């Protein structure tokens, strides 16, 4: 297993990787979203394996459209239990997208208190990390607070594909950190935020509707990175892939 100390270099590279990745910054975005051409990723990595019959998927019905993500309960059991429990309780229904960083992340799930909730009476749970899941574009992740713990806040990685987000410098640092070739190759095609690996929980991967996530990612935001016009999560549903 890759030692977490090797991540220092990638974390230091984060600021460089994010420079210039936005479509507009504060107040950015426009009335018509720019279509992002995302290539198909041919990879043996779990996140790029199409869902199989019986896999658990989450369906996000938003005011901007619908997107779907396959979940990986075997890799993040506490996050899965909490997320599914909150979905079944209707917690996310009616919440709005709380943060958008174009070309980086789309985030929601804070709730009225701005902190989020859990099925354990608000008690936090630790981030769950694994060598099997990574912050590729389209990854569904659970946000962490300052203590490194999670609640209901989730985000989708909305980084641009290929070298638009994964620069040669990041590739070199992944190689130096001991990444396997398959992971580096997947990052080079899909794009992503490798500097977030091993810092928080990857719970799933968007397999349909990434164009909706991209459209949300290009919305105009205020100085707090909140969309100027509300983008509402009408509902989140858990179902089995058929």
Residue positions per predicted region:
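Cyclophilin-like peptidyl-prolyl cis-trans isomerases
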Residues: 2, 21-242
């Amino acid at each position: 297993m890759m030692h977490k100390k090797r991540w220092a270099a990638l974390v230091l590279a984060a600021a460089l990787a994010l420079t210039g990745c936005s479509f507009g910054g504060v107040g950015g975005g426009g009335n018509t979203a720019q279509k992002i051409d995302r290539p198909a990723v041919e990879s043996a990595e779990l996140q790029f394996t199409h869902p199989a019959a019986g896999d658990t998927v989450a369906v996000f019905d938003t005011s901007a459209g619908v997107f779907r993500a396959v979940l990986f309960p075997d890799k993040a059991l506490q996050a899965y239990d909490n997320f599914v429990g909150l979905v079944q309780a209707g917690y996310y229904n009616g919440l709005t997208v709380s943060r958008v960083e174009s070309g980086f992340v789309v985030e929601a799930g804070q709730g009225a208190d701005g902190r989020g909730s859990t099925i354990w009476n608000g008690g936090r749970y630790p981030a769950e990390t694994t060598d099997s899941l990574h912050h590729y574009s389209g990854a569904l992740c659970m946000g962490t607070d300052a203590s490194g713990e999670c609640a209901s806040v989730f985000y989708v990685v909305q980084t641009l594909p290929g070298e638009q987000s994964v620069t040669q410098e990041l590739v070199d640092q992944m190689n130096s950190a001991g990444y396997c070739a398959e992971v580096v190759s997947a990052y080079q095609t899909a794009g992503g935020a490798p500097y977030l690996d091993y810092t928080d929980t990857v719970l799933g991967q968007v397999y349909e509707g990434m164009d909706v996530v991209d459209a949300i990612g290009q919305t105009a935001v205020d100085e707090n990175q909140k969309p100027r016009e509300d983008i509402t999560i009408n509902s989140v549903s858990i179902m089995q892939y058929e």
